[in-house]
Amino acid sequence: VFDERSIEDLILARAKSPNFTALHQFFIENPKALPFLVDLSLSQKTHPVPAYSAWLLVHIVKANPGLLAPFQEQLTAGLLQTANHSVQRSLLVVLLELPIKRKFKGELLNYCFEVFANPDTAVANRVYALYHLKRFVKSYPEIDQEVRSIIAILESQEMKPALRVGIRNYLKH
């Protein structure tokens, strides 16, 4: 029987181990524990619980996207609300592995524009937001021009290599 406390204890016990992310296999084998992991990733608990929980979600969705599909709306809502950059990064990656849903579509689109355009946001988060924008362009080709105008502004400034690579990938339609 799983509860939030037992899952939190499991994460904390394994947090410092070199193969921490191998813990994702436990959740693949015990999907009844997933709601607690999702809740912990979106919680206000102290570090490292939310960040490490969200990090495990990345490994779970890459191994078996269907396991997290039922939580997509909850994860999207959590992404839109969290200020934790580590959790944001992981949730952006998780949602890239799932199909775009109608609920929160507009909010997610606006969020990704804000994250991508904000120079104070962590570079990885900006790149993953850009990858979401690339997906949105398929449904909304008119946003491509807006994305490209942000890119033009960014290219006139000093840029981290990871952001440059993300932009190059975006432009490779």
Predicted regions: what they are:
Residues 1-173:
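Alpha-helical scaffold domains
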